[in-house]
From Swiss-Prot:
Protein name stated in the entry: AT-hook motif nuclear-localized protein 12
Domain of life assignment: Eukaryota
Comp. bias (Pro residues): 85-95
Molecular-function annotations in GO: minor groove of adenine-thymine-rich DNA binding
UniProt entry keywords in alphabetical sequence: DNA-binding, Nucleus, Repeat, Transcription, Transcription regulation
Subunit (UniProt): Homodimer. Interacts with AHL27, AHL29 and ATAF2/NAC081.
Listed InterPro entries: AHL, AT_hook_DNA-bd_motif, PPC_dom
Compositional bias (Polar residues): 48-59
Compartment list: Nucleus
Protein source organism: Arabidopsis thaliana
Gene giving rise to this polypeptide: AHL12
Span of domain PPC: 154-297
Length: 361
């Protein structure tokens, strides 16, 4: 038929005549319209897999089922060859795995030090003096006080000890605190006091009547003072005094130096005692003297203990020698059934440390 053949498509009633061999580069839309295929576009490429067939070729229509040509469908690529990205670079080579050592790891391993740091580290000088162990000299309490001056070194106290003094109702608080400070040759500092006062006698230095007495009750607001040891007046001589601030029920306050302070109920006074000045030096010297006196006594006691065991060992040895002579044949007998009981008793008396031989009859 002049190089053309008729082809019918499903769903249509008209017949189309197409030239033979025109289906190799036709798109499906062009085949359906019956138009001749235009020249192939540069962006169109034939399908690389020849096994894929158009569904219309596998399903022949009823009028013309022996159509002998195969229609190859190609995939249209919108990207050009220039837009193809290059393949990714190969991954870097993996580092060789370090073989793990067998066994239990060390608890305190040596730090890893590079060769460069070892070479750069300076060598220790053998002539350099070694650092002494312990606290360096000049860091003690006396050295720190010496930096502040001689007056600070001589005025610093030692052996600080806190105290709580309890005064019952009706007792004089000032007299009780003074008697407490006279018990030992130590300075006493009053920190505070709490309680109720029934009456107080204050010293007013500017008035003609130096003693003013007030009747309470009063509440103690503040209570303080100090008693220092008088070096020239004896061990019981003290210098110093007490001061108090009291509050009345109406809110008024009276204060001044204390001459007499009577407690209305239990009053507690917090104080501290310490050694200072020349007493501190004497205290240290006395401690050294006591230690020196104790050391010879301990040496004498040790020498007596060394001589005592030797002298005690001699009577013990003599007693050990006399003990076998007190044994008699009547007190020690042989085993029952043996005919030589008296002979064994004599052997035991001669040598009391001899073991018994159970194999003998």
């Amino acid at each position: 038929m002049d190089g053309r053949e008729a082809m019918a498509f499903p769903g249509s009633h008209s017949q189309y005549y197409l030239q033979r061999g025109a289906f190799t580069n036709l798109a499906p839309s062009q085949v359906a319209s019956g138009l001749h295929a235009p020249p192939p576009h540069t962006g169109l490429r034939p399908m690389s897999n020849p096994n894929i067939h158009h569904p219309q070729a596998n399903n022949p229509g009823p009028p013309f089922s022996d159509f002998g040509h195969t229609i190859h469908m190609g995939v249209v690529s919108s990207a050009s060859d220039a837009d193809v990205q290059p393949p990714p670079p190969p991954p870097p080579p993996e580092e060789p795995m370090v073989k793990r050592k067998r066994g239990r790891p060390r608890k305190y391993g040596e730090p890893m030090v590079s060769n460069k740091s070892r070479d750069s580290s300076p060598m220790s000088d053998p002539n350099e003096p070694k650092r002494a162990r312990g606290r360096p000299p000049g860091t003690g309490r006396k050295q720190r006080l010496a930096n502040l001056g001689e007056w600070m070194n001589t005025s610093a106290g030692l052996a600080f000890a806190p105290h709580v003094i309890s005064i019952g109702a009706g007792e004089d608080i000032a007299a009780k605190v003074l008697s407490f400070s006279q018990q030992r040759p130590r300075a006493l500092c009053i920190m505070s006091g709490t309680g109720t006062i029934s009456s107080v006698t204050l010293c007013k230095p500017g008035s003609t009547d130096r003693h003013l007495t007030y009747e309470g009750p009063f509440e103690i607001i503040s209570f303080g003072g100090s008693y220092l040891v008088n070096e020239e007046g004896g061990s019981r001589s003290r210098t110093g005094g007490l001061s108090v601030s009291l509050s009345r029920p109406d809110g008024s306050i009276i204060a001044g130096g204390v001459d007499m302070l009577i407690a209305a109920n239990l009053v507690q006074v917090v104080a501290c005692s310490f050694v200072y000045g020349a007493r501190a030096k004497t205290h240290n010297n006395n401690n050294k003297t006591i230690r020196q006196e104790k050391e010879p006594n301990e040496e004498d006691n040790n020498s007596e203990m060394e001589t005592t065991p030797g002298s005690a060992a001699e009577p013990a040895a003599s007693a050990g020698q006399q003990t076998p002579q007190n044994f008699s044949s009547q007190g020690i007998r042989g085993w029952p059934g043996s005919g030589s009981g008296s002979g064994r008793s004599l052997d035991i008396c001669r040598n009391p440390l001899t073991d018994f031989d159970l194999t003998r009859g």
